[in-house]
C-alpha cells in the first residue's frame, strides 16, 4: 500500500510553491477584485459589492488576467512575499488560509474537485456585484458588504 502524500498546500510554505500551485490556490471567489474602502479613523478595510471593471460578474474571474495591470494599474498582485499582509483578504481566501497555516475549506476546488462549488456555497459574490463603471465612486459606501480582518 502506497503512503498517502499530503497535498502541496499542507507540506509547502507559500514561498516553496511553483507558479501553477500558487495560481491554483485562488478559489475564484473574486472577492479580492471588489473595491474596498478604508476607514480613515481606525484603518479598517471594508469590502463593497463594486467589482473591478475587468471582473466577470458571474464567473468571478478576470476577463483579461494576463494584461490586467496594463488596464488597471492599481490591480493588486498577490505574491508569497506579501503573506504577512494577507489579513485584508477574506477569511475564506486560500492564500490567507495557507499563509496562516490552516487547511483549505471543503468547498475549495483543490479539495472537492469542483471549481463551481465556491459559487454553489455562495462564498463568491457571483450575481450580486455591480461593475465599477455602473456606480459613481462617491456612492461606493452605500454598497458595503463586510469588514476585512
Curated annotation (Swiss-Prot):
Pfam families on file: CxxCxxCC
Domain of life where this protein originates: Bacteria
Similarity-based family: Belongs to the UPF0260 family.
Protein name (database record): UPF0260 protein PSPA7_4092
Provenance organism: Pseudomonas paraeruginosa (strain DSM 24068 / PA7)
Amino acid at each position: 500500500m502506497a503512503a498517502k502524500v499530503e497535498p502541496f498546500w499542507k507540506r509547502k510554505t507559500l514561498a516553496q510553491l511553483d507558479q501553477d500551485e500558487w495560481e491554483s490556490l485562488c478559489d475564484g471567489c473574486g472577492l479580492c477584485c471588489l473595491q474596498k474602502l478604508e476607514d480613515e479613523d481606525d484603518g479598517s478595510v471594508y469590502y463593497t459589492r463594486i467589482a473591478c471593471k475587468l471582473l466577470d460578474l458571474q464567473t468571478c474571474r478576470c476577463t483579461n488576467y494576463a494584461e490586467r495591470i496594463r488596464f488597471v494599474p492599481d490591480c493588486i498582485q498577490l505574491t508569497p512575499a506579501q503573506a504577512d499582509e494577507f489579513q485584508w483578504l477574506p477569511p475564506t481566501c486560500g492564500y490567507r488560509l495557507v499563509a496562516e497555516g490552516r487547511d483549505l475549506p471543503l468547498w475549495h476546488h483543490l479539495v472537492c474537485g469542483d471549481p463551481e462549488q465556491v459559487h454553489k456555497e455562495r462564498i463568491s459574490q457571483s450575481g450580486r456585484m455591480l461593475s465599477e463603471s455602473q456606480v459613481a465612486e462617491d456612492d461606493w459606501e452605500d454598497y458595503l458588504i463586510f469588514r476585512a480582518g
